[in-house]
Every structure is written in structure tokens, then in C-alpha cells.
Curated annotation (Swiss-Prot):
Keywords (A to Z) from UniProt: Cell inner membrane, Cell membrane, Membrane, NAD, Quinone, Translocase, Transport, Ubiquinone
Primary enzyme class: translocase
Location in or out of the cell: Cell inner membrane
NCBIfam families: PRK06074.1-1
Function (record text): NDH-1 shuttles electrons from NADH, via FMN and iron-sulfur (Fe-S) centers, to quinones in the respiratory chain. The immediate electron acceptor for the enzyme in this species is believed to be ubiquinone. Couples the redox reaction to proton translocation (for every two electrons transferred, four hydrogen ions are translocated across the cytoplasmic membrane), and thus conserves the redox energy in a proton gradient.
Enzyme Commission number, as recorded: 7.1.1.-
Subunit and partners: NDH-1 is composed of 14 different subunits. Subunits NuoB, C, D, E, F, and G constitute the peripheral sector of the complex.
Gene: nuoC
UniProt-recorded Gene Ontology molecular function terms: NADH dehydrogenase (ubiquinone) activity; NADH:ubiquinone reductase (non-electrogenic) activity; quinone binding
The protein, known as: NADH-quinone oxidoreductase subunit C
Reaction it catalyzes: a quinone + NADH + 5 H(+)(in) = a quinol + NAD(+) + 4 H(+)(out)
One GO term describing the cellular component: plasma membrane
Lineage, top ranks: Bacteria, Pseudomonadati, Pseudomonadota, Gammaproteobacteria, Chromatiales
One Pfam family hit: Complex1_30kDa
């Protein structure tokens, strides 16, 4: 960690430790995790006292199946990865099928705020976990950073996270008749319904999805020297 980051981390720890704040460093970036109850005061302090004038991004996170992978390997070969992959993630199920929910540790939903200090030329990530998994809610920061308006609407639309005090919390990406929140891990990857144009009714209609979910494994074919079979290399050497 650079000297500038060390100084910022020390300031953040000193300022927010009493309120339950925790500072972590990874990949040259700092993350400040604060309790939901202290988020509003923390956001105002970051803007007014530490110079983070700008919110450049905000997103929701669903940790329901964090770390669960359907295919993983530490080895590869010129034969490619195995194509026989078992479905593992919670969202990969057929329409109307009840999937088994996997247990997870810690809070399920979090909101991540990416902050920029123009005056100090520094960036900071603030993370807040929702206390209630069934009804995830945090306070809005639109009164701290006005740019949070549409970001919070997007997180509400895709993850179902409520932002208490938001002036106009409604869907922004999906249509008004959409059911559910598509970025949640328990939302089926194939969706609930599909649309098609019905020429007899002369309008768009909804119907149950006809797509069968399957696990896709990338298959990469390269012809450079790193992936040529040993036998081919031997023939080339003999020529």
C-alpha cells in the first residue's frame, strides 16, 4: 500500500472506528465498511470532512452464492476444459421449478458506493450491508450526493434493495409489469416469462419461457505456439 493510502486508511480508521467502521486494503484500493445505522453520518463526513465530493457509482450486491462456481479448475490442457458440467448455482433452474437454496454466511445484500475526491485525487469504496435479508433497506444518500438518484433506482430495480427517503424510488430498467428483481441470485437465469409478437392479436404477448437452461463452458481454440500439441512440435522439429 502506498504512503498516501496508508495515511488515508489511518484517517478513516480514526474517524469511523467508534461507529463500527472497518477499513480494508486490496489491489491498491481502500474499502470502508460501515453499519447501516451509521451510513448517513458517515457519508456526510466523507463529503464534508475528507473531501469526497463526488459519488461516481453505486451498485447492489447479492452474496447469496458468493464463491459457488459451476466449473473451476487450476489446470488446463490443449484438450480444453471438461464439457460435462453439473449445474450448481441457485438461479439455474427451469420455469416453475423449485430450486434448493444454499446456505450463506453473513448478510446477503450490500450496497457499494464508489467515491472520488477531486481535490485530493483519491478514490474510496464504501460498503454497507443490509440488516434484513427479507426486506433489505438502507438510507438514501441523494441528499449527500445528488448523483445517487438514478443509481439507487437501478439497485432497487435489479436487486430489490429499498432506499429509505429516496424522492422517487421506482423501476428504471425493467418495464412496469416486470415481476421480481433480475440480479438476485434466486432469480432464474431464463426469466419467468418471454415476449413475442402475436400477429393474430396484433400485439406483444407474454408466455412462459421456452428456453431450457444449460451450463456454458468457454471453449477457446488458439493456433499459436503456446497451444500446439507436443506431437506437432516434434514433427516440426524433425522437418
Amino acid at each position: 500500500m502506498s504512503e498516501r493510502l496508508e495515511k488515508l486508511a489511518a484517517r478513516l480508521t480514526e474517524r469511523f472506528k467508534a461507529a463500527g467502521g472497518k477499513v480494508d486494503s486490496a489491489y491498491g484500493e481502500l474499502t470502508l465498511t460501515v453499519p447501516a445505522a451509521a451510513m448517513t453520518d458517515t457519508a456526510k463526513a466523507l463529503r464534508d470532512d475528507l473531501g469526497f465530493e463526488m459519488l461516481i457509482d453505486l451498485c447492489g450486491v447479492d452474496y447469496q452464492e458468493y464463491g459457488v462456481a459451476e466449473w473451476s479448475t487450476e489446470e488446463s490442457s490443449n484438450q480444453g476444459f471438461s464439457r460435462g458440467v453439473e449445474k450448481a448455482t441457485f438461479g439455474r433452474f427451469i420455469f416453475d421449478e423449485v430450486a434448493e437454496r444454499k446456505a450463506h454466511e453473513g448478510p446477503r445484500f450490500a450496497v457499494v458506493y464508489h467515491l472520488l475526491s477531486i481535490s485530493a485525487n483519491q478514490r474510496l469504496r464504501m460498503k454497507v450491508f443490509c440488516e434484513d435479508e427479507e426486506f433489505p433497506v438502507v438510507s438514501t444518500v441523494t441528499d449527500v450526493w445528488t448523483s445517487a438518484d438514478w443509481y439507487e433506482r437501478e439497485a432497487f430495480d435489479l436487486f430489490g434493495i429499498m432506499f429509505e427517503g429516496h424522492p422517487d424510488l421506482r423501476r428504471i430498467l425493467t418495464d412496469y409489469g416486470f415481476v421480481g428483481h433480475p440480479f438476485r441470485k434466486d432469480f432464474p437465469l431464463v426469466g419467468h416469462v418471454e415476449m413475442r409478437y402475436d400477429p393474430e392479436q396484433a400485439r406483444v404477448v407474454y408466455q412462459p419461457v421456452s428456453i431450457e437452461p444449460r451450463v456454458l463452458v468457454p471453449k477457446v481454440i488458439r493456433q499459436d505456439h503456446r497451444y500446439v500439441h507436443e506431437s506437432a512440435q516434434e514433427k516440426s522439429a524433425d522437418a
